[in-house]
Amino acid sequence: MSIKDGHTEKLIRDTAMRIFFKEGRFHATTQDIADAAGVNRTLVHYYFRSRDILFKQVFEEGRTAFFKKLDEMVQPEQSFRVKIEHLIDIWMEQGIEYPFLDTYLVSQLNNPSVLEELTENRVDNEDRKAAFYKEIKAEMKAGSITKMEPMQFLLNLAAMVSYPIIMRPLLERALSIDEKDFNKIVAGRKEAILKTIFLK
């Protein structure tokens, strides 16, 4: 085989993404992925060489797509409330589609090499970030949201959005609910968060 098939490569990548981050099977083997994709294990090695390389690629792909959406969220022509609504939507959609992506990320935060990999390709737009902080302060001054440091506001927002997703297995067991019920709860989080954040 000398010519790579883009369709097959995408099939393997999408299958790996589902197994690793939708099903939470972080230790799945190339044989597991091949079986789920309906291809020979040799093809998985042909396209990605190893299970670890495939894992790293699909994780990076998911992370990059998430940050790209966040960058689009802070476009200046949108109102502050719309930006926050979009941020919640983006986070919730990813959390429902790939519930174990954030879980894996949190589990690796004490690994210096992983932290370096997470940040080395992430070039923040300082001007855009500063403008967003300025918007937060303006909303506080207008009385739309509670006054605090902008970073505290963002931390509160991140916690309210991500906590249920990261704690999903525990919450499902503690509340005696299934995946369908949990997704309904998550779907209602947006309105609950907006009511908590905005004073008017």
Language-model-detected regions and their locations in the chain:
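Short secondary-structure transition hinges
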Residues: 92-131, 152, 178-184
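Helix-turn-helix
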Residues: 11, 15, 19-53, 57
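Short alpha-helical scaffolding segments that buttress acidic/His motifs in well-ordered protein cores
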Residues: 88-91, 104-109, 157, 161, ...
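All-alpha amphipathic helical-bundle segments outside canonical DNA-binding/catalytic cores
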Residues: 82, 120-123, 140-158
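C-terminal peripheral helix-coil segments that are non-catalytic and often amphipathic
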Residues: 130-142, 160-200
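Hydrophobic alpha-helical connector segments
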Residues: 72-100, 150-154
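Short, basic, alpha-helical segments at the C-terminal edge of helix-turn-helix-like DNA-binding modules
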Residues: 60-65
